[in-house]
Amino acid sequence: MSTRVELFCDGACSGNPGVGGWGGILRCGATEKELSGAEWETTNNRMEMTAAIRGLEALTRPCEVVVTTDSQYLVKGMTEWLSGWIRRGWVNSKKEPVLNRDLWERLLELSKTHRIQWTWIRGHNGHAENERCDALARGAIDELRKKGQGRR
């Protein structure tokens, strides 16, 4: 597992819940790939998580991945909370079912394939890749609205 990859990711939501988008940049050396998508009825946290999932799913072999995101929910979930949720049967510290369990389980599966370092950065603070991911997410929302496909 020697290939080192950087994944920058962000999610956006117009209304929460509402129409949402996600954006990601995969970087391996000098090569970059941009990814994005959108959904009609979602939340900001789901889009943040989806950005990371889609980026990790795009990798064709096991890698060392540095995931950089402005989502404390995502970083803390993966580095601090996940083991407790699993130990308690997917119940949080308030004894309530963990939200977005489907996405946490997918991230857990992907973390078995890749060696992942989760890194938090402050959002909307001039970080070039984070700003680009935000633009990708918002662009995906705009595209979905223009197409009007999948509208409930």
Swiss-Prot record:
Residues forming coiled coils: none
Domain RNase H type-1 stretches: 1-142
Record carries keyword Transcription regulation: no
Reaction catalysis annotation: Endonucleolytic cleavage to 5'-phosphomonoester
EC number(s) recorded for this UniProt protein: 3.1.26.4
Binding annotation for Mg(2+) 2: D10, D134
Record GO terms (molecular function): magnesium ion binding; nucleic acid binding; RNA-DNA hybrid ribonuclease activity
GO BP term, pick one: DNA replication, removal of RNA primer
Record InterPro entries: RNase_H, RNaseH-like_sf, RNaseH_domain, RNaseH_sf, RNaseHI
Subunit-level organization: Monomer.
Name of the protein: Ribonuclease H
Gene: rnhA
